[in-house]
Each structure stands twice: as C-alpha cells, then as structure tokens.
C-alpha cells in the first residue's frame, strides 16, 4: 500500500512537490530512534576498552547513564538523589524479594538490585513495554546483574498474579514482598497497590517506595497510603479498581507513610513516598 501511494505521489511533478514534506516525515518517523534506543546506542557504541572497563560493574554503568542524561538527554529514571534515599532504605531493610512496577531501561533495577547483597535475594522488574524490556535486559546484563534481576514483560496486574502463584514454589519461605518500588503509570499507583493488597503480597515488614510524588504528582496515591482506615474503607467500596473489581484492596491495613522531598537545584522539586506496612486491623 505504501509503495502504491509513493508511486502515485511521484508520477506528477506537482504531486511530488506537494508530497515532498509528507515523504520526508514518513522517512523520518520510520528511521528515527526513540530516546531509549538512543541510550542503548550510546552505551554499546562506547569504545571496546570502555565497555570492558564497565562490564560487570553496576556503579560504572549507572554513571554512564547519568552522564548521558547530564548531556541533555531526558530519560524517565529515578536519578541519583531520589535513588540514594531508596537505596539507603534497601540497605536498612535487606530485602530478600524486591519488585519494581515500571522497569523502563533498567536504571532502577541496576541501582537497587546491586544493593541486594544476600546471594539468595532477588529483584523482579515488571515492565509492560517489550521494547523497553529488551533494552533493559541488555543494560542489566552489561552491569553483571542478570543473575540477580528477572524482567517480567506484561501488564503489572497479570505479572503480580503470576508472582503470587510462583514465588512460594521458588522461595519456600516466601510470605510477602519485602520491598516494592513503584515508578510506572501514575494513574495505576493506587490500582496496582490494591492488587498487591488483595493478593496478600503486602504484609508484615513490607516497604513500598514510590517515585514522582510531586512531579508530575500522584496526590491520590499519597492520600491513599497516608489516609485513615475510614478513608480507605470508603475509597475501596466506592472506587472500582480499573484492574478488575476483584482487586478491591484491604482497607484495614495500617500504613506509616512519609513524603521525602528532593531538590537538585536544577529542576522542579520532586519527592519519593516511603510507606511501611504496620499491621492489619
């Protein structure tokens, strides 16, 4: 069909002149790489000596990505400052099982996965976009963390249901997720938390860290984790979960939650939300 349209457009000088901007646009969109592919290109086009130098070194791979961003290439990574807050919490908690909702290009999986020093600890990165997952897999492998990080491609709800089924078989002592990092679609923060509550993936000792609390902002999520039991009871009973009505959530969970603001002096202020499961009433 494209070839026929191209023939029709180019068989007349007038049509050709009128179509030239359109043709350039088509060629541009067909050949233009996404910013995530450009990152992949940048990393794996480094001199072999440099690649060998950073291979198997998570910190060095993170530095390369940070340098790329500092050159003016925007990526949806958590970055150094907010990442440091969560990394310190991971070091304190020492999770055995950690998951993230929104793996993107693998930055957070590398940054946080390297904190899991226990040989039996594992990091599950849930990513809905197969193209992002493919890029992340290559970068995580470069960092030497393929044995520590498992990427699961698909809708978060489906992946969470599968993890609930499979984790007890992989880890016989598994009860709850030790640590959850949320950094995907902002309108899914609350719905996916309710999925985890319903599936009993959140329990005694679970920590939930969420990004982009102020920019672009997730006020509904903050209100949910900081709200009273009465608030969540009404919310769960009146707001249907977009992931399915069966994932109603558990309003009787008592959370201790805090918004931690970060300002790098260059961009608008942002924050992370650190939420701890205290008990269920």
From Swiss-Prot:
Binding site for Mg(2+): 183, 211-212
Catalytic activity: a catechol + S-adenosyl-L-methionine = a guaiacol + S-adenosyl-L-homocysteine + H(+)
Alphabetical list of InterPro entries matching this protein: SAM-dependent_MTases_sf, SAM_O-MeTrfase
Residues that bind substrate: 186, 212
Keyword Transferase: yes
Enzyme class per UniProt: transferase
This protein's record includes keyword Transferase: yes
Lineage: Eukaryota, Fungi, Dikarya, Ascomycota, Taphrinomycotina
This enzyme's EC code(s): 2.1.1.6
Biological-process GO terms, alphabetical: catecholamine metabolic process; cellular detoxification; methylation
Family classification: Belongs to the class I-like SAM-binding methyltransferase superfamily. Cation-dependent O-methyltransferase family.
Disulphide-bridged cysteine pairs: none
GO cellular component: fungal-type vacuole
Named cofactor requirement(s): Mg(2+)
GO MF, any single term: metal ion binding
Protein name: Probable catechol O-methyltransferase 2
Record keywords, A-Z: Catecholamine metabolism, Magnesium, Metal-binding, Methyltransferase, S-adenosyl-L-methionine, Transferase, Vacuole
Signal peptide bounds: none
Cofactor notes: Binds 1 Mg(2+) ion per subunit.
Subcellular location: Vacuole
